[in-house]
Amino acid sequence: MLDSFYALSFPMQKNKLVNKCAFAWNHLVRFLMQKTYPAYCRRHPLSRGICDTVYEAPLIVSFTSFPERIPTIGATVESILRQSLKPNKVLLWLAKEQFPEEKVPCELKKYLDAGLEVRFCDEDLKPHKKSYYTAEAYPDSIIVTIDDEILYGESFLRRLYEAYQNSDKHTVICELGHEIRIGDDNKPKKYNEWNWEAIGLEGPSDLLMPKGAGGVLYPPGFFRDEYFDIEAIRENCLMADDLWLKFMELLHGYKVKKTRAYAKNVYSSKQETQKYALANSNNGENRNNVFLSNLVKKFDQIHWEELK
């Protein structure tokens, strides 16, 4: 059902006028999607959303959330449990300090029988929770991270997995991404000066940074010791997991590939959830530039001028 709406939307283009027209149309598509999907889900009860299929490695979808988002998270959960390619696990991580009773929120209980697992973690690592704790528990799995406010089309997971199968296994796969631009000093330019959305670029490339909202697939063995340095995460980029993961890719020689050069944007489940959006906060306050500067200094062994 969601795939049908995404099929109606226009992919992002380099031409600004075309993009402006496409934005207006896509805004209408998003509005209709948000209004009709809950009714569709009520009329078509969920079946089991996970499977025991043996893939190249266990296929796990992982995400996190927080109390303010829980009332609207159901649509995202529905969209993941209705994938045409079923994962082996769907994990939702919640911080114990935000959910001290360690009880599954009422809004989520109906999804447990369909395959959702809700787990409680000791430390609130903000957006890092969605990858950190799953990678710690299942290091040899294929881990797909998603956002808790996005409606994912039924073919989303299949598209990521097929791109992974057709790529070098030292490649991170994403739907959406930005292209890092390098300055005259052979260091990354400011975050807001990058090639946002990397329109027309598919990769694989060292300079593509996956955009978490679109969904990202990390191959088995991607998460090394450096990734689990909680102190470094806290000190440098607690609110920017995308940047931390990008530097892990660069440290260990992983390139990034998009599933398609001209990607389609993803749509949130509810308009009002945007006020809690981490990306909006980081970008609006230019905090990503601070996080980026911190990481460039910490990982000064990266030779930016050699990246392609």
Where are the regions a protein language model picked out?
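Cell-envelope/extracellular polymer assembly enzymes that use nucleotide-activated donors
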Residues: A57-S62, K89, W244
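A conserved hydrophobic helix/loop-capping motif in glycosyltransferases and polysaccharide synthases
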Residues: I60-E68, Q83
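Short, acidic, metal-binding catalytic loop of nucleotide-sugar glycosyltransferases
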Residues: T76-N88, K96, K110
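Active-site-proximal specificity loops/subdomain of glycosyltransferases
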Residues: W93-S141
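Conserved catalytic core of nucleotide-sugar-dependent glycosyltransferases
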Residues: T134-A135, G153-I230
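Short beta-strand-to-loop acidic/aromatic patch adjacent to the donor-nucleotide binding site
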Residues: D140-L151
